[in-house]
Amino acid sequence: MLTHVGTNTIETERLILRKFEYTDDEAMLKYWVADEKIQSLYSEPVYSTKEEVKGLLDKYISSYDKSDYYRWAVVEKKSGECIGQIAYFLVDNKNHFAEIEYCIGSDFQCKGYATEATRAVIAYGFNKMNLHKVQICTKTINKPSKRVIEKCGFTYEGTLRDYFYMDGEYVGRLYFSMLRTEFESKL
């Protein structure tokens, strides 16, 4: 049975995954929410003002009182900066699975942070939430994200062809998943 425990702090070797705070607004603007390329790959709008980011933070922060809400600020321990986010944005209570989404600012990409955060959230899902399956998707054009997903040990499930229309062309959506038994066999 799925157990809802909400967004609790997770610590890894180089990161702290914690609830968003209003003081994260400047780092969010600096590192990712105003970056059109990142937001496009993430299928999110660009936020260009503190007021817009405050509205986004209002949505996140007001949801933390729900035990079935899972969204973390990804904070680099060394700098104390909020460098991205990760979430179980879709949680299916009936079928005991959840889907991860993540976003890391371009200054911090290709350093293993997305992999480190994703592995921690996978473990949280299986160990704390009692999930049966974790799934994750990426656009076919997002090669760095595909590498993160593969490094985390997900199994490729299939491609939804021409799923997104971006910049005048169609882009596919890759689906990956990990079952509890697969996670446990890697321990």
Where are these predicted regions, by residue range?
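Conserved GNAT-fold acetyl-CoA-binding loop/helix
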Residues: 38-59
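Short, conserved alpha-helical segments within structured domains
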Residues: 45-49, 70, 141
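Acyl-donor (CoA/ACP) binding surface of acyl/acetyltransferases
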Residues: 1-27, 31-39, 75-187
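A short helix-loop-beta-strand connector motif used in the catalytic cores of GNAT acetyltransferases and
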Residues: 59-73
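Hydrophobic residues in alpha-helical segments
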Residues: 32, 42, 64-65
